[in-house]
Amino acid sequence: MGRANVKHVARHGITPEECEEAYRNGPMVIERQRRKHERRRLCLGETQRGRLLTFVVIERKGKVRFVTAYPMHGLQRRVYRGENE
């Protein structure tokens, strides 16, 4: 994760390790966008400690880059829980 992105997600109280963990745990992709030859995905995921995160990733040349991440809000939490119970 780039330094600017680390600072950005830190403002939301999230660490890079939490982002990577939620991604590795098989996130639910709820929206896909294409912007400037990039595929952005809005994802809902959970850390090993049960923290629910929303994050946006870009997949480029086989690598994943986190654009932003923040704690899930109510509607996202309901969608995630409904799909993963």
Predicted regions and their residues:
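Ribonuclease/tRNase effector modules and their secretory precursors
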Residues: 1-85
